[in-house]
């Protein structure tokens, strides 16, 4: 537990996969938590113990109430870059520590070196933070395990084959819970201050093997059918921006037949890194067909 006079931690991106988990971790650690939401109705999804503030990264002055007397900020940049400099300047003037959720764009593995507009934006935010001077920790998760929910759960729940490109592309999915655990510690543990951590899962797995792992968690066969990049583009129309689809296809193509970049950062910081198989077992209910 932490002293009652501990400065509050402001968490952005609280309706997202990582931010929501961080709120829980910080509250469990006894820290006062402020949650930034764009819409007041989003407060209904958050724990009552979290103090909710309405603000928008595109309107830097709207952050001032949430930043007053705060000690640290978890920053997920979800806005266009136009307001980034003004937001970072406000953070640097008001809080001691910033933990940024970025990406592994500095990692030389070809998977992370494909054209990626989001990685370019992350690099821009990193430069702004470095110039502004707050104590900063940068977290660089690779592929999140929870992507499987959006990508494959609809087909599996419907009892269908997973139709996906580049089945032999290898990634090392990192459990969202591990990312949140590292981020929460970085927000209050001085030993993690100033770090730069590439966070991956502990094992390189092909995409087809990841689908099989979900099937094993369900105790059901889940067929995997390879489709072409062109077909993937067609079926993705309307559900994902073209730039994102191109980025994914380029990254997967670069990862075919090549072991994924695997780090020990999660285990070094937490003692253990959750495997994708463990993630699949813990989330099997989200994939289970209604009739099974």
Q: Which residues are covered by each model-predicted region?
A:
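Oxidoreductase cofactor-interface core, primarily capturing Rossmann-like NAD(P)-dependent enzymes
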Residues: 2-45, 58-61, 65-70, 79-86, ...
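Cofactor-binding loops of NAD(P)H-dependent oxidoreductases
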Residues: 55
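Hydrophobic "lid"/C-terminal helical patch
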Residues: 183, 187, 214, 248-252, ...
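A general structural signal marking secondary-structure boundaries and capping sites
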Residues: 190, 255, 287-290
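Terminal hydrophobic/aromatic helix or amphipathic segment near a protein terminus
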Residues: 213-257, 292
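Amphipathic terminal alpha-helices
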Residues: 269-292
